[in-house]
């Protein structure tokens, strides 16, 4: 979440108490000695599924897989009130202590540095103990508009084709990091998760002693519905048969750097269970304590803790799908961490006419890489609320999970693919792969193009050579110039997902246009999807 751009969702305030000087610190260790674990026996510290994922991607085990040395955590105890958790990837512990004792921690011979990551702490009674006033820093982008049928958001990225081919994410493990998942137990859209025992893990990192993640903010429920919902006629999402890990990483009341460590802790937990995909509709740049803020020059994929964690997850064979942010009004380089991390998919938002949503953050990263990589419909997709009702919302929070679902179905279809192969296939399927930019990235991905791309050698062509005319339409006849093949599949859909045309069309030569007749087409803006043996394209058509 990000205060600066009013990202993602409304946060409810919690009660505070005054006068408590205990804060939360990250304690980084210099070394990582091990006596109980060996790289030759990874089954001692990783699940079988995690080991299989490493083997599939030919990823060696390394010291990052080892836990923090227990003798270090034991040695700290006289100087702290509590250890909240440790991070093996950061070789650190997040602890509760006061400022004076933090200085004694810094003096320990095995401590590299101590950093304040949050003011105050949570007691096990559930109360927030902090000397700062409550905060409600995030602006809401949730709309009460319920007119958007889910068909459109699915059609845009090829979910119907994926389902028709029999792929619904089965056997793929997806982790969702968010601020809570209320209503999931009661909602019919999620009933199958419990009937089929698809929930493989639950973790509250904010309050590690809490065992109930089906509470707090409904943002996580909204996000989860765009991956997992299966309620025909209401919402059927792309990967409803996927297995899932639900992790509560966001502190509703405040915005401190500890949430980066919460994210990393959840990623380590998910990794240990063998997760395939992480969906994170979260982002960080500015904090309640200005001294913790990052500058845009630090969005280089390696300067923020959370981007380091996301990059490590990617190197472990996990596909991280992250919202690029809702700071589009700020212009270029308005993304947030960890969307800047290398090797992940950062996701922006488009409107129902496939143009960039005004709120969608833009790249590039500080080191010049294209961001976002891909986009999906984020300006009003249909989703499920915590009360089980259908709704619609806007934000890159809601475009990212749609692509996480697409990735899960594609990985089910191609189980031998490495994470890198999956990433490349999704990117190459983008509607503007040949001419990427820092607004739409490589464009809108598509299941059919990603699935067949490996076999058919999909590559981009100059989008400027793709033309539909007359546009706006002046008659029922429309001509399309696209690619060099003699046959193309043409699909025409409206913003509600209704399909008006879906046929194979032929032409006599590669220089001739494809000709189609669109009878009884109502007035409006339509999206034409084009598929041949080499590429996929997306064009807009206007009917006055």
Stretches with model-predicted labels:
Residues 163, 230-233, 247-340, 366-369, ...:
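Substrate-binding/access-modulating region of protease and related hydrolase catalytic domains
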Residues 227, 247-251, 334, 378-440:
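Hydrolase catalytic cores
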Residues 151, 275-279, 412-471:
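C-terminal subdomain of the subtilisin-like protease fold in secreted/lumenal serine endopeptidases
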Residues 22-82, 101-103, 112-124:
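Primarily auto-inhibitory N-terminal propeptides
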Residues 22, 39, 160-259, 273-276, ...:
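Subtilisin-like serine protease catalytic core
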Residues 462-469, 473-544:
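C-terminal outer-membrane/trafficking sorting elements
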Residues 71-154, 162-163, 342:
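Autoinhibitory propeptides
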Residues 188-200, 352-397:
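Catalytic-core environment of secreted peptidases
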